[in-house]
A protein has these predicted regions:
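Short active-site oxyanion
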Residues: 51-54, 72-79, 121
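Cationic, low-complexity basic patches in intrinsically disordered or flexible, solvent-exposed regions
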Residues: 14-18
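Glycine-rich beta-strand-to-loop/alpha-helix junction loops that act as flexible
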Residues: 53-61
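Active-site histidine-anchored catalytic micro-motif
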Residues: 67-75, 83-92
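Conserved phosphate- and dinucleotide-binding cores of soluble alpha/beta proteins
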Residues: 31-34, 46, 84-240
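Short helix-loop-beta connector
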Residues: 44-52
């Protein structure tokens, strides 16, 4: 059996176009994340001092921010990180990483988001670090959220809502989520920095983010969920 040459030509042409589109998409996304990372640097640069402690979130946009922050590391004291991944990147840049227990104040917390509503309510936790992110955000004087414009939404809920759970409670929590109208999906082969599991919740009504954040966190076995309604950012910077 021999495939006609013309068929092969159109197949490879189609594959080439598809790969070019993917390449251009990721190039544009990278440019957007670099753009908003620079905006965050511009926002905090003149407010930095040798006593300043930054809070650093987790995720691809934050990674770009850390890269940009490298040039300013002598202008501030150090950082409290929300994940082991971010801590590692900060140390690679020779930025001192502190435990939250060892600092009196965090001046600015910089982090991304999976969704941002018009009221600055967030969904976070795509990287599974939302529990520590929420803790560090709550300890900061000012929360600066940095996102590309695709993350701005009219209503939260298109992105699955991450819920961190104690491993032994995963099934019982999932049943409670079903009773609330959600569709729980166990995030396989993933363990949080705290040694817990993640349930990603689809199809749940988040029209009242504050109420749902409380409701989910009151389920026995839930550590925290990815709604940031009570710890929402004071500032949201969006890519051009």
């Amino acid at each position: 059996f021999r495939v006609p040459i013309i068929t092969c030509f159109f197949y490879f042409k189609s594959q080439f176009k598809s790969r070019i589109k993917i390449f251009l998409y990721y190039n544009c996304m990278s440019a957007a994340k670099i753009s908003v990372a620079k905006k965050a640097i511009d926002y905090i640069e003149k407010k930095l001092s040798i006593e300043t402690v930054l809070g650093i979130g987790t995720g691809s946009t934050v990674n770009y921010f850390i890269n940009e922050l490298d040039a300013y590391k002598n202008l501030f004291r150090g950082a409290v990180s929300s994940s082991e991944a971010s801590s590692q990147l900060l140390r690679e840049k020779n930025i001192e990483v502190f435990s939250l227990n060892d600092v009196n104040q965090i001046d600015f917390y910089i982090d991304g988001a999976d969704e941002v509503s018009p009221n600055n309510f967030l969904i976070k936790g795509g990287g599974g670090a939302h529990t520590r992110e929420k803790i560090v955000a709550a300890a900061a004087q000012e929360f600066i959220c940095i996102v590309d414009k695709t993350k701005m939404v009219d209503k939260l809920g298109a992105f699955p809502l991450p819920v961190e759970v104690i491993p032994e409670a995963r099934s019982s929590v999932a049943r409670k989520i079903v009773a609330l109208g959600g569709k729980p999906i166990y995030r396989e082969n993933f363990i949080t920095d705290q040694g817990n599991h993640i349930i990603d919740v689809e199809e749940i009504d988040i029209s009242e983010p504050e109420a749902l954040e409380i409701l989910l966190n009151n389920i026995p076995g839930v550590v925290d969920n990815g709604i940031f309604a009570f710890n929402k950012p004071e500032v949201v910077l969006v890519s051009d």
